[in-house]
């Protein structure tokens, strides 16, 4: 039978690397009413706090613990007091509240994602209080702030599915004894975009306009001109083009990470049915899938 040593306070064989606790997926719908014209923000927020002491871990002493239920209530109260102008501003408000209210909180991390509601509109007329859920990319942000420093803000896009039926190929790759993939000059190209960028300065930044700009760049570089498209020789090239254009158009951001899971669509062989299928009927395959990633940052000389 194993024997367990209970006097953990004398254990000098381990040390803390990082600690934190908090509340995940705190959901809020905030309604801004300007007469009969209403605006909404629905968000899911996760908060992590790091404390200056470790006595809760070492000794089970909870005297420094801010209950996670209190963290949840604080998120709700800040939505009431501050509103949600942007998810980035809301996350910064949460960080600064805990750092200013509790001297023993030394680090805050807040993740917020926005549920994609869009105001109903018809013939250029916007509805005053009705919205439709439009899953065309989720806006999220991550804000971290230490007691001794300013907030570090990342924003991003996820769950943005895109597909084009031509103007994509894949040729010239390495072939060995295990290669069965044929070269192709024309194929479907589909991906689920994950894109995250870091702001090097946040003063007077319009976070929502920046998000819209980068989302537009993603779509424009993926699709190309509306009348003819733009050829993509590889997922990697499209990924890099998105990053270069984004950093050139948005001077407030310093780096950008993109992940493009390559969603495969394969031509279905109908020859046994006596049919010729010329890339008209394709089979979507969820797994396995290719995953292409890349992170770029501004060169130091370009920041000066």
From Swiss-Prot:
The modification Phosphoserine is found at residues 39, 63, 232. SUPFAM superfamilies: Tetrahydrobiopterin biosynthesis enzymes-like. Catalyzes the oxidation of uric acid to 5-hydroxyisourate, which is further processed to form (S)-allantoin. PANTHER family: URICASE. The modification N-acetylalanine is found at residue 2. GO terms for cellular component: peroxisome. It is found in: Peroxisome. The active site is at residues 23, 68, 264. Pathway: Purine metabolism; urate degradation; (S)-allantoin from urate: step 1/3. This is Uricase. Pfam families: Uricase (PF01014). Keywords: Acetylation, Oxidoreductase, Peroxisome, Phosphoprotein, Purine metabolism. Its main location: other. The modification Phosphotyrosine is found at residue 289. NCBIfam families: urate_oxi. GO terms for biological process: purine nucleobase catabolic process; urate catabolic process. Urate binds at residues 68-69, 170, 187, 235-236, 262. A motif (Microbody targeting signal) lies at residues 302-304. The modification N6-acetyllysine is found at residues 10, 23, 27, 36, 118, 122, 164, 175, 185, 221, 228, 278. The modification N6-succinyllysine is found at residues 10, 23, 221, 228. Belongs to the uricase family. It catalyses: urate + O2 + H2O = 5-hydroxyisourate + H2O2. The gene is UOX. GO terms for molecular function: urate oxidase activity. Its EC number is 1.7.3.3.
């Amino acid at each position: 039978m194993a024997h367990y040593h209970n006097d953990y306070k004398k254990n000098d064989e381990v040390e803390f690397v990082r600690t934190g606790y908090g509340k995940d997926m705190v959901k809020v719908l905030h309604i801004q009413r300007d007469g009969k014209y209403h605006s909404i923000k629905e968000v899911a927020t996760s908060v992590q706090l790091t404390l200056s002491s470790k006595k809760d871990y070492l000794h089970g002493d909870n005297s420094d613990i801010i209950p996670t239920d209190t963290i949840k209530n604080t998120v709700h109260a800040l939505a009431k007091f501050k509103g949600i102008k942007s998810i980035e501003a809301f996350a910064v408000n949460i960080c600064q509240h805990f750092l200013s209210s509790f001297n023993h909180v030394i680090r805050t991390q807040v993740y917020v994602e926005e549920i994609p509601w869009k105001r109903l509109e018809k013939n250029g007329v916007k509805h005053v209080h009705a919205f439709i859920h439009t899953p065309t990319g989720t806006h999220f942000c991550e804000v971290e702030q230490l007691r001794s420093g300013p907030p570090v803000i990342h924003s991003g896009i996820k769950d943005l599915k895109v597909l084009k039926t031509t103007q994509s190929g894949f040729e010239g790759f390495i072939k060995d004894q295990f290669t069965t993939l044929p070269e192709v000059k024309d194929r479907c190209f589909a991906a689920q975009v994950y894109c995250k960028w870091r702001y090097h300065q946040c003063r007077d930044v319009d976070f929502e306009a920046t998000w819209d700009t980068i989302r537009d760049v993603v779509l424009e570089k993926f699709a190309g001109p509306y009348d003819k498209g733009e050829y993509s020789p590889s997922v990697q090239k499209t990924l890099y083009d998105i990053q270069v254009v984004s950093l050139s158009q948005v001077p407030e951001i310093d780096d950008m990470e993109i992940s493009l899971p390559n969603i495969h669509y394969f031509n279905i062989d109908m020859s046994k049915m006596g049919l010729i299928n010329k890339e008209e009927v394709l089979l979507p395959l969820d797994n396995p899938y290719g995953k292409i990633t890349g992170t770029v940052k501004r060169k130091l000389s370009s920041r000066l």
